[in-house]
Amino acid sequence: MERFPNIEKLSTSKESHVLKAWQGLGYYNRAINLHKTSKEIINNLDGEFPSTYTDLIKLKGIGDYTASAISSICFDEFNPVVDGNVMRFLTRYNGIKEPIDSKKTQNKVKEIGKRLIDKTNSPGDFNQAMMEFGALICTPFPDCDSCILSSKCTAYKKNIVEKLPFKLKKKKVKERFFNYIVLVDPKNKTLIEKRIKKDIWFKLNQFPLVETNFKVNNIRKVSSFNKFINSQKILIKINTFSVS
């Protein structure tokens, strides 16, 4: 916030500077999208942040969840937020047995949320309460006996709380092999490159990388470690060489 105190400052900054300031926070695509959105607002929207769901969702990096949250909490639009916590609560409360990774179920839960939020006077407060309830009460391992809604909860009455919600598809863990080459010259200087592969590290600086689909054993290794990201297992090797 000190580096980019307002949207004008952010929009005129270099993307590399934004990524540098974001360093260590993870989810670097969010920084890239934030920068692109700031330019869109300044250049095409006269510097005015959109105030409706319809306009918000057009911005880079803003999907249904974020557009619903902003439009309801900031601008009192009646758009239900459905995150993982809300999804868990509403599927249990309504006894929805369909897999939550299907679009049909997601739309069904969204429709339930819409019917509920339309009955309120404060859509922002409603959405925040729903998210808090799922995060603190209707957790993955809930204390249903202490829940004020258990007597009306379909899953609780049918003794299927632990079975809901469920996903039909299980992501297969993909293995990736990263072999970084660290070159050091007599002046203790090294070489870095900008990552051009479009993944979560897109446009970030890195040591020269050789990515393979198999484990490489015949390179001099300094250190190695594994990193689990989403459904990926990344095996990383750091290989250092002196150059003259």
Task: Label each PLM-derived region with a short phrase.
Residues M1-D143, L149-I160:
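Catalytic cores of DNA base-excision repair glycosylases
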Residues A135-S244:
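Intrinsically disordered, low-complexity, charged terminal extensions of DNA damage-control enzymes
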